[in-house]
Design a protein with these regions (language model features):
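Class I S-adenosyl-L-methionine-dependent methyltransferase catalytic core
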Residues: 1-231
């Protein structure tokens, strides 16, 4: 008889620990900024929430993830939305949030839930505001979700650009070798295929001695172009 796979917490390095601290401080600053506006409803949205607990590669011990930290924010948020595609992670997260009527946990595709269910309810005119943490495991977040959040005027986005997955699966030195699945994922993340003209430029040296026709741009150039696209 097959047993269920053992659940293991994600391991995080020092940079991820620092990122968690930054998000935690930003959350407190965000709610503090609206402290004198009681009519505003402030929501915290974590689109790739994880289990709420991580293992530190540095110490070997457990550390709180972004959801657990957000729940302790002072001044507090009025509601929390935690989303993750991994049912085991959301199951563990529910154990952390027992008794919290202000917490909503969703298992599934973040982009689908954000665009079809959650973001349409974050209405600027009804004094709703949201801090959205987009820290995808890879190229799992779609442009449609980011675009809707940006156009709402009610949402502040905190996006961790998935550079590693982008380089591993979509933007290679030889663009002709990239599999269709990688291209499709990048298209959904970017919103269209215009990333190609950003990621690759014509080789100024020409095609000498078998050199490639195009040259892959640096991560910094690509991320900067995406940042401008979000404006």
């Amino acid at each position: 008889m097959n047993s269920m796979p053992t659940f293991k917490f994600d391991q995080v390095g020092i940079w991820s620990e620092l990122k968690l601290e930054i998000v935690e401080k930003y959350g407190a600053a965000y709610t503090a900024a609206f402290a004198n506006e009681p009519r505003l409803k402030k929501y915290y949205v974590d689109a790739f929430s994880g289990a709420g607990v991580h293992i530190s590669k540095r110490s070997g011990g457990t550390i709180e993830g972004s959801p657990a930290r957000a729940l302790k924010t002072s001044p507090k948020f009025d509601g929390f939305y935690f989303i993750d595609m991994d049912a085991q992670k959301t199951a563990h997260l529910k154990t952390i949030c027992v008794g919290r009527s202000d917490v909503h946990i969703e298992t599934g595709d973040a982009s689908e839930y954000l665009t079809k269910v959650l973001l349409p309810t974050i209405d600027y005119g009804k004094y709703n505001r949201a801090l959205c943490l987009f820290d995808p495991y890879g190229l799992h977040l779609e442009w449609r979700a980011m675009e809707l959040a940006g156009k709402s005027r009610a949402v502040d986005m905190f996006l961790n650009f998935p550079v590693m997955d982008m380089n591993r699966n979509a933007i290679w030195r030889n663009p002709d070798a990239v599999p269709k699945d990688g291209i499709d994922r990048m298209n959904r993340f970017w919103g269209d295929d215009s990333w190609r003209s950003t990621a690759y430029v014509e080789n100024a040296q020409g095609n000498l001695f078998g050199a490639p026709d195009v040259v892959k741009q640096s991560n910094e150039v690509i991320v900067s172009a995406f940042r401008e696209r979000l404006r």
